[in-house]
UniProtKB/Swiss-Prot annotation:
Belongs to the YajQ family. The keyword Membrane does not apply. The keyword Nucleotide-binding applies. NCBIfam families: PRK05412.1. Pfam families: DUF520 (PF04461). GO terms for cellular component: cytosol. This is Nucleotide-binding protein YajQ. One of its GO terms (molecular function) is nucleotide binding. It comes from Escherichia coli O127:H6 (strain E2348/69 / EPEC). Nucleotide-binding protein. SUPFAM superfamilies: YajQ-like.
Length: 163
């Protein structure tokens, strides 16, 4: 029986490359001359700390970071940015989290979407991923289209496609 897994992962090496590219762009931009602005990627907690001297510059840095992430193949929706920007001393910063794995509420929504599509497939939750099995390849590809079309706030990848 054909099957595949639905996962949500971010390649940390690509994220590191995007952070390095964004740092290089900030160093060369005229509007960030003589300004303390930086990006810090923490591999352990999977967060990116964006630091600058004012709140609007933090927002500009976030836009630069999103563009660089997109160029490296990481969707902007995989970056979870809190609304409030923290002010500490003379710097402003925000810690954006990279979304890894699928939360249980989102998993249930995906399984419900698959069941509501009336396709002849079975979806089962396995840890932080979802295994989908069906009799035909076409049904599985239709499930992929349903999951991509659903607006669930994070990107999904499809792995272990077996025939």
């Amino acid at each position: 029986m054909p099957s595949f897994d639905i996962v949500s992962e971010v390649d940390l090496q690509e994220a590191r490359n995007a952070v390095d590219n964004a740092s290089r762009e900030v160093e060369s931009r005229f509007d960030f001359r003589n300004v303390e602005a930086s990006f810090e990627l923490n591999d352990a907690s999977k967060t990116i700390k964006v630091l600058s001297e004012s709140d609007f510059q933090v927002n500009q840095l976030l836009d630069i970071l999103r563009a660089k992430l997109l160029k490296r193949g990481i969707e902007g929706s995989s970056l979870d940015v809190p609304e409030n920007i923290v002010h500490s001393g003379k710097t402003w910063f925000v810690e954006a989290k990279l979304k890894q794995g699928i939360e249980s509420a989102t998993q249930k929504k995906i399984v419900k979407m698959i069941k509501d599509s009336k396709l002849k497939v079975q979806a089962q939750i396995q840890g932080d991923e979802i295994r989908v099995t069906g009799k035909s390849r076409d049904d599985l590809q239709a499930v992929m289209a349903v999951v991509r079309g659903g607006d669930l706030g994070q990107p999904f990848q499809f792995k272990n496609f077996r025939d």
